Amino acid sequence: MSFNTIIDWNSCTAEQQRQLLMRPAISASESITRTVNDILDNVKTRGDEALREYSAKFDKTTVTALKVSADEIAAASERLSDELKQAMAVAVKNIETFHTAQKLPPVDVETQPGVRCQQVTRPVASVGLYIPGGSAPLFSTVLMLATPARIAGCKKVVLCSPPPIADEILYAAQLCGVQDVFNVGGAQAIAALAFGTESVPKVDKIFGPGNAFVTEAKRQVSQRLDGAAIDMPAGPSEVLVIADSGATPDFVASDLLSQAEHGPDSQVILLTPDADMARRVAEAVERQLAELPRAETARQALNASRLIVTKDLAQCVEISNQYGPEHLIIQTRNARELVDGITSAGSVFLGDWSPESAGDYASGTNHVLPTYGYTATCSSLGLADFQKRMTVQELSKEGFSTLASTIETLAAAERLTAHKNAVTLRVNALKEQA
């Protein structure tokens, strides 16, 4: 089924509807799983030596110094245009503003007289950021990860990227307060961050996107007792657009293509109650596609994408919630009114003037989002991902005395005698003091 095929949702059977919302299959092959496991064990055992060998093998680069020097970062900064630096500064300011606003006030309540309960927040002590290399370096992801890490107060923030590291990535790291940058890519970088080597410090939590090997490495280290936590499960990028008859077809098409050009496994979906709008968007996609440098990649993504005509906007919202897109764009005349009905989406973009690109780069929201249906249970990345919550309780003698019989009754009902004794001993001590 080509992207130009317009599908009438209500003419489909329940099984056909289910198939229409299926995502491109992702699974780590046995060979990837084994290869990654071997890389993890090798890096854990041999440290820096293994990292250099993998750089020569996979990146075709001889790495002498794994850590990027301050002079190299300064030189990279000099090579960038003032225009790009200014654009990064604007983006960082907006990201800072939005993520600073996410700080939670401390909770401090008396649940009953003499029983004080608190919730306090602490930063994750050390975090590692992974930034892919390649022809289009994702320096914007540095801004999205390092900025909230700094606001959260993480004491150690380090970054790994395949050599040679792009000037934009090095400058973004410096701009956002990353302390150390390392010439390490792939699954071996995840291993280095999870276990530590002579040069790369072990971190508590790893953030950032990557290829199938990086994704599998993150999964494996997150399940090892000697590994590290990770940000969220990863999957192909996706966007769903809800458009009414008043939407601009060229705008809708550009948003669909901005997602499709990410990779051949990306998925884009248009939901509209207007069949003419669907046709006009399909035509606009073809026109714009012809001008794109990454047209072949986008075409592959469009093979798994859909143009769906619905009964009305309410049905569009219902289908969107069922799919749970990473990015949801609502280009309707009543976009704000539809938000309360949205239950599953990574990030929502309202109206004609809120392209996905705004959130990808500079509006202030984070572009690290749950995908592949994980929006049903996972949140978009935010300040909380770089923090942990801790509870505190303090009972006075009076508070303890009042609550003691309740605790004893509950502990006895669960047959946890030591729990009950911890209370009874104190009750008896208070009686002796009286």
Curated annotation (Swiss-Prot):
<feature type="binding site">
    <location>
        <position position="414"/>
    </location>
    <ligand>
        <name>substrate</name>
    </ligand>
</feature>
<feature type="binding site">
    <location>
        <position position="211"/>
    </location>
    <ligand>
        <name>NAD(+)</name>
    </ligand>
</feature>
<keyword id="KW-0862">Zinc</keyword>
<keyword id="KW-0520">NAD</keyword>
<feature type="binding site">
    <location>
        <position position="262"/>
    </location>
    <ligand>
        <name>Zn(2+)</name>
    </ligand>
</feature>
<feature type="binding site">
    <location>
        <position position="130"/>
    </location>
    <ligand>
        <name>NAD(+)</name>
    </ligand>
</feature>
<keyword id="KW-0479">Metal-binding</keyword>
<comment type="subunit">
    <text>Homodimer.</text>
</comment>
<comment type="similarity">
    <text>Belongs to the histidinol dehydrogenase family.</text>
</comment>
<dbReference type="Pfam" id="PF00815">
    <property type="entry name" value="Histidinol_dh"/>
</dbReference>
<feature type="binding site">
    <location>
        <position position="419"/>
    </location>
    <ligand>
        <name>substrate</name>
    </ligand>
</feature>
<keyword id="KW-0028">Amino-acid biosynthesis</keyword>
<feature type="binding site">
    <location>
        <position position="259"/>
    </location>
    <ligand>
        <name>substrate</name>
    </ligand>
</feature>
<dbReference type="GO" id="GO:0004399">
    <property type="term" value="F:histidinol dehydrogenase activity"/>
</dbReference>
<protein>
    <recommendedName>
        <fullName>Histidinol dehydrogenase</fullName>
        <ecNumber>1.1.1.23</ecNumber>
    </recommendedName>
</protein>
<feature type="binding site">
    <location>
        <position position="188"/>
    </location>
    <ligand>
        <name>NAD(+)</name>
    </ligand>
</feature>
<dbReference type="InterPro" id="IPR001692">
    <property type="entry name" value="Histidinol_DH_CS"/>
</dbReference>
<comment type="function">
    <text>Catalyzes the sequential NAD-dependent oxidations of L-histidinol to L-histidinaldehyde and then to L-histidine.</text>
</comment>
<feature type="binding site">
    <location>
        <position position="327"/>
    </location>
    <ligand>
        <name>substrate</name>
    </ligand>
</feature>
<dbReference type="GO" id="GO:0005829">
    <property type="term" value="C:cytosol"/>
</dbReference>
<feature type="active site" description="Proton acceptor">
    <location>
        <position position="327"/>
    </location>
</feature>
<feature type="binding site">
    <location>
        <position position="419"/>
    </location>
    <ligand>
        <name>Zn(2+)</name>
    </ligand>
</feature>
<dbReference type="GO" id="GO:0000105">
    <property type="term" value="P:L-histidine biosynthetic process"/>
</dbReference>
<comment type="pathway">
    <text>Amino-acid biosynthesis; L-histidine biosynthesis; L-histidine from 5-phospho-alpha-D-ribose 1-diphosphate: step 9/9.</text>
</comment>
<keyword id="KW-0368">Histidine biosynthesis</keyword>
<feature type="binding site">
    <location>
        <position position="360"/>
    </location>
    <ligand>
        <name>Zn(2+)</name>
    </ligand>
</feature>
<dbReference type="GO" id="GO:0008270">
    <property type="term" value="F:zinc ion binding"/>
</dbReference>
<feature type="binding site">
    <location>
        <position position="360"/>
    </location>
    <ligand>
        <name>substrate</name>
    </ligand>
</feature>
<keyword id="KW-0560">Oxidoreductase</keyword>
<dbReference type="GO" id="GO:0051287">
    <property type="term" value="F:NAD binding"/>
</dbReference>
<feature type="binding site">
    <location>
        <position position="262"/>
    </location>
    <ligand>
        <name>substrate</name>
    </ligand>
</feature>
<feature type="active site" description="Proton acceptor">
    <location>
        <position position="326"/>
    </location>
</feature>
<dbReference type="InterPro" id="IPR016161">
    <property type="entry name" value="Ald_DH/histidinol_DH"/>
</dbReference>
<dbReference type="InterPro" id="IPR022695">
    <property type="entry name" value="Histidinol_DH_monofunct"/>
</dbReference>
<feature type="binding site">
    <location>
        <position position="259"/>
    </location>
    <ligand>
        <name>Zn(2+)</name>
    </ligand>
</feature>
<dbReference type="InterPro" id="IPR012131">
    <property type="entry name" value="Hstdl_DH"/>
</dbReference>
<feature type="binding site">
    <location>
        <position position="237"/>
    </location>
    <ligand>
        <name>substrate</name>
    </ligand>
</feature>
